[in-house]
Structure formats: C-alpha cells, structure tokens
Amino acid sequence: KLILLGAPGAGKGTQAEILCRELSIPTISTGNILRAAIKNGTPTGLKAKSYMDAGQLVPDDVIIGIVTERLAEDDCKNGYILDGVPRTIAQAAALEKAGITFDDVISIEISDETIMERMSGRRVCESCGASYHMVAVPPKQEGVCDKCGGKLVQRKDDAPETVKARL
C-alpha cells in the first residue's frame, strides 16, 4: 500500500504505472477516476468538472468519497498505489478516519519549470486515456493514439495558465 506524492506533472502517474506492473497491484488515480466520472456524466463527475476546468482542486469530501469507494473493490485487497491523494492534511486525516492505511510514501520532487515543460507537451487519448508527450514519448502519427486510433488532446488542466494556478 503506497502513496505517491508530488505536484501535477511530477511523474506520479508514470512511476505508478511502472510500480503497479512490478507489484501486480492497481493504481488508484484520483484524476483518472474523476475524468471517468465526468465522461460518464455522473453526479460526482459533474460536480468535479467545474473545479477541474478552472484548475482548482476538487473538494476533499468528493475526493475521499470516490477513493473510499474504489479501495473497497476486490482488486485492492492485496495492496494499491494511491496517485494524487492525499493532497491536503484534511484529506490525510479523512483517509485515516476511514481506516485507509498505507505502508510507504514516495514523494517526487521536480522544478516548476520542468513541470511546465512536461504538461505543455502532454497529450491524452480521448478514447482510451493513453498518455503521450510530444517530445519525450510522441505517438507514431501526430494527434492519433497508437493503441486505439483515438484522437489525442491536451487536457484543459494542462494548459499553461491552469498549470501555473495549480502549482
């Protein structure tokens, strides 16, 4: 049971992907859960959308609710990697109160300049969620996902002005 901490764009998702393959445990990414809820038009998704589009943090009660639900699923019984939570002291306290435990914390530290470079080049597939970087990990064909052929887009929360606000 691990928690990955770091600013948006620090590489938590990338490292979580590697660790989950090696350890055979799921990665629980609050960002991915929220984006799926938005795509599916759930009440939680609609509530979160306005915050995310503005580059603001989604309220703690919403985050803790979705994380608690997800961690109750069978694939988390043997461990998990939390990516993006807790982000605040209040979230950490709420996780503890909910009986959610962890064994280790990994904090990823990089400069704001590097974060800006990474996020400005990040593209995500609208269909399958695969992630690319236009310089470091580009798709074979610009704007097209290698995995499913879907359209690659820049997330609204990766726009430079939004990234600055999130830092």
Predicted region positions:
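Glycine-rich phosphate-binding loop of ATP-dependent small-molecule kinases
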Residues: 1-167
